[in-house]
Structure formats: structure tokens, C-alpha cells
């Protein structure tokens, strides 16, 4: 059995937590995040800590409490420090540029690809083959990174495409004559 829910989440100074039934709002210097928790989870806020436990009558109470603890911990980290995700473009002529909240990609198609960023997410391109996504919501950053990667996933023979910076692409050997 996982014991993730047994550990409390420490709320640092400068972070405001509001609990309204199952709706939790966490506000910090990087913005405000809101999440609705499962009915099986009971959250208590006291002494700058959030503690989690199951409600009576739910078989999956501890599992849901562990999930809620992990989600709220990510929210606290997001509003204080924020999250970053790096993407690399590998391939001849593959380029990226950021104009406002639109990421412009040249990925070998006959047309450029423009990807609109959701609210709360910023992107920058230190080089033409690198994209850095920043924001407070870990889930949204991961989804945007997955959407950008989906335009041209790394292919298994030369490894060309959009990849995460920490991703290892396994390449196959070319067919022998």
C-alpha cells in the first residue's frame, strides 16, 4: 500500500490556501490554481500544512487521498517556483520561434505550424532548435509539450523530430542489402 497521503504538504509563507468543500484554491506569487478533489478525500488545513485522509464509506479513499496529496503538492510548487519543460528540435531545417503567445514551428511540412499557447504558459526559444515552456500548472505544461511533440515525433531511424530534452530516442539499424 502506498503511503503518499500520510505525508503532509507544507504550505510556505506567501501562499494562500482556500478550502470550499471539495474545491481547493491555492494562490501564490506565480498565480492562482484551483482544483476540485474527489469526494472520497478529506483535506484539513492547519499550522501551514495540508493533511489528507479518506472519508468513511469509500473503498478507494486512501488511493484518492494519495492522488490528491500529489496534485496539491504540485500546485504549491507551481505557485511558488513554477515548472519548466524543455523541448529540442532535431533535423535539418527544423526551427522554432515564439511571437507573443504563439509558437511558430518549421518541421518539414509544406506550411509552418502555429501553436497557440494556453493562458498562464509562456514559451521562449534560447536557440532556433530549443523551446522552453514555463508556467505554474504542471499538467498544462506537460500537455502543451506533448502537443508540440505530436506535430513531429522522433522517428526511429535518424531520431529526427521534436523531443523532450531528457528523452532518449532509441534508433534502429537501417535495412542491410
Swiss-Prot record:
Organism domain of life: Bacteria
Keywords: Acetylation, Ribonucleoprotein, Ribosomal protein, RNA-binding, rRNA-binding
Gene Ontology molecular-function annotations: rRNA binding; structural constituent of ribosome
Gene3D superfamilies linked to this entry: Ribosomal protein L6, alpha-beta domain (3.90.930.12)
Pfam families: Ribosomal_L6 (PF00347)
Listed GO biological process terms: cytoplasmic translation
Disulfide-bond pairs as recorded: none
Residue positions where N6-acetyllysine is found in the record: 44
A GO cellular component annotation in the UniProt record: cytosolic large ribosomal subunit
Function according to Swiss-Prot or TrEMBL: This protein binds to the 23S rRNA, and is important in its secondary structure. It is located near the subunit interface in the base of the L7/L12 stalk, and near the tRNA binding site of the peptidyltransferase center.
PANTHER family: 60S/50S RIBOSOMAL PROTEIN L6/L9, LARGE RIBOSOMAL SUBUNIT PROTEIN UL6M
Subunit structure: Part of the 50S ribosomal subunit.
Family: Belongs to the universal ribosomal protein uL6 family.
Full protein name: Large ribosomal subunit protein uL6
Organism from which the protein derives: Escherichia fergusonii (strain ATCC 35469 / DSM 13698 / CCUG 18766 / IAM 14443 / JCM 21226 / LMG 7866 / NBRC 102419 / NCTC 12128 / CDC 0568-73)
Amino acid at each position: 500500500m502506498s503511503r503518499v497521503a500520510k505525508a503532509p504538504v507544507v504550505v510556505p509563507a506567501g501562499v494562500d490556501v482556500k478550502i470550499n468543500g471539495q474545491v481547493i484554491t491555492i494562490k501564490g506569487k506565480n498565480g492562482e490554481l484551483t482544483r476540485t478533489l474527489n469526494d472520497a478525500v478529506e483535506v484539513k488545513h492547519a499550522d501551514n500544512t495540508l493533511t489528507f485522509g479518506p472519508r468513511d464509506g469509500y473503498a478507494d479513499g486512501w488511493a484518492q487521498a494519495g492522488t490528491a496529496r500529489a496534485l496539491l503538492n504540485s500546485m504549491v510548487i507551481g505557485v511558488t517556483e513554477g515548472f519548466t519543460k524543455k523541448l529540442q528540435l532535431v533535423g535539418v531545417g527544423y526551427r522554432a520561434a515564439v511571437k507573443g503567445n504563439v509558437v511558430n514551428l518549421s518541421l518539414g511540412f509544406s506550411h509552418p505550424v502555429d501553436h497557440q499557447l494556453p493562458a498562464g504558459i509562456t514559451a521562449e526559444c534560447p536557440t532556433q532548435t530549443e523551446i522552453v515552456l514555463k508556467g505554474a500548472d504542471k499538467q498544462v505544461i506537460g500537455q502543451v509539450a506533448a502537443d508540440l511533440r505530436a506535430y513531429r515525433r522522433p522517428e526511429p531511424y535518424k531520431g529526427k523530430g521534436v523531443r523532450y530534452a531528457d528523452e532518449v530516442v532509441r534508433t534502429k539499424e537501417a535495412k542491410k542489402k
